[in-house]
């Protein structure tokens, strides 16, 4: 394991304004040798006198690689969206080449799948975001630092019944031209990125999913290295897996996981498409579903800890298998040969106690949890990691950040 780059102490401590000023200082240091680089935009409306900006840590809540591995987009809890260049010349401390801030907290987002620092078509270097009481908006990732970021497109996300804007708790691009947004009451919308109005808005019926599940929040869309059809899946905070056919706007309840967990927050697929790996809040296991058996539960990957409200997002690498961080700064690994067969051996037997990890890598100091792991699509050995202590804790130092690692 080798650390390639990191954000240093930029996000250490508490205070949103403090983090942005340290980030600016690192950027200014890069400018001194004569690099022709622009200024970084300042946060909007931040003043040191506002107590909330002194108290809250700046934790990264989303990481997305560009398709060619040239850059990394990070969404932080200071309402900032940052893009980092990934190159050997940048040195060990990472500073964003672009950043902008939203006045409101970002609930969910999706980066265009063709985004790249070397992408000539600027219409592909975009991110769609959802904020509370706001319509969905599309922003450029490459903007003029001397001007506030302006939305390229605004989408009509208002509910026809209440006329209030639906907040999206999950967003994902379906292809290069369309994106999905998941909100409350099992509602999913499909948008053409170039048009204001949705193509369709649909939800799982009360008859199909039950009265309680009908009111559930769509929390995530499935993630896969390879897709074999147009069907997508979504998880809800009622621990239900939904099946979505974008061609017909059909949404149906596919599997309800009945355990003591409190909702699905991530769905990963094996490369062969046979197995789905379900990450849940307040759970000590990853549930394994078999798509060939109507999403029957066929196994459990046991975690040596219990997840809580702060989500720990994993990734699936063809080379390194399923990876997820824990609360002790370690990466737990299930090898590819285990993941591709659902942890089921040749005899078809499954241990009653579940499958434990096949490898552990120590990454961060004890007390820092690994919140997100994202593989580099252009280099199977490189991963981006977001780490922080418990953001709800009382630790004043609250050392958080991002690092790039070669496994």
From Swiss-Prot:
Associates with snRNPs. This is Protein SWT21. Its main location: nucleus. PANTHER family: TELOMERASE CAJAL BODY PROTEIN 1. InterPro entries: SWT21/TCAB1_mRNA_Telomere, WD40/YVTN_repeat-like_dom_sf. The keyword Nucleus applies. It comes from the Eukaryota. Coiled coil: none annotated. Involved in mRNA splicing. Helps to stabilize the U1 snRNP-5' splice site interaction. Belongs to the SWT21 family. Keywords: mRNA processing, mRNA splicing, Nucleus. It is found in: Nucleus. The gene is SWT21. The keyword Cytoplasm does not apply. One of its GO terms (cellular component) is nucleus. GO terms for biological process: mRNA processing; RNA splicing.
């Amino acid at each position: 394991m080798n650390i390639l780059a990191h954000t240093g102490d930029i996000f250490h401590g508490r205070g949103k304004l403090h983090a942005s000023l340290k980030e600016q200082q690192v950027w200014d240091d890069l400018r001194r040798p004569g690099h022709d680089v622009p200024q970084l935009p300042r946060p909007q409306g931040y003043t040191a006198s506002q107590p909330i900006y002194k108290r809250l840590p700046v934790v990264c809540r989303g990481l997305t690689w560009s398709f060619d591995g040239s850059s990394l987009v990070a969404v932080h809890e200071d309402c900032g969206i940052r893009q980092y260049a990934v190159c050997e010349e940048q040195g060990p401390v990472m500073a964003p080449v672009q950043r902008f801030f939203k006045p409101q907290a970002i609930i969910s987002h999706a980066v265009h799948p063709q985004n790249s620092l070397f992408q000539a078509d600027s219409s592909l270097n975009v991110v769609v975001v959802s904020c509370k009481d706001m319509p969905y908006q599309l922003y450029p990732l490459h903007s003029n630092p001397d001007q506030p970021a302006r939305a390229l497109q605004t989408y009509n996300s208002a509910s026809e019944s209440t006329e209030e804007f639906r907040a999206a708790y999950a967003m994902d691009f379906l292809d290069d031209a369309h994106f999905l947004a998941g909100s409350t009451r099992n509602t999913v919308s499909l948008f053409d990125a170039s048009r204001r109005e949705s193509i369709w808005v649909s939800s799982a019926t009360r008859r199909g999913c039950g009265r309680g599940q009908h009111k559930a929040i769509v929390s995530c869309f499935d993630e896969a290295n390879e897709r074999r059809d147009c069907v997508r899946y979504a998880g809800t905070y009622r621990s239900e897996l939904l099946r979505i056919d974008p061609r017909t706007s059909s949404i149906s309840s596919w599997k309800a996981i009945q355990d003591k967990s409190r909702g699905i927050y991530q769905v990963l697929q094996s490369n062969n498409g046979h197995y789905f790996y379900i990450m849940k809040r307040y759970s000590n296991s990853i549930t394994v579903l078999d798509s060939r058996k109507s999403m029957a539960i066929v196994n459990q990957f046991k975690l040596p800890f219990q997840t809580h409200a702060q989500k720990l997002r994993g990734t699936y690498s063809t080379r390194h298998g399923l990876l997820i961080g824990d609360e002790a700064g370690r990466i737990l690994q299930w090898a590819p040969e285990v993941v591709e067969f659902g942890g089921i051996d040749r005899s078809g037997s499954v241990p009653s106690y579940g499958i434990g990890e096949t490898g552990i890598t120590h990454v961060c100091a004890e007390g820092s949890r690994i919140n997100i792991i994202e593989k580099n699509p252009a280099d199977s050995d490189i991963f981006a990691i977001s780490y922080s202590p418990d953001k709800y804790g009382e630790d004043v130092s609250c050392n958080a950040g991002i690092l790039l690692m070669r496994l």
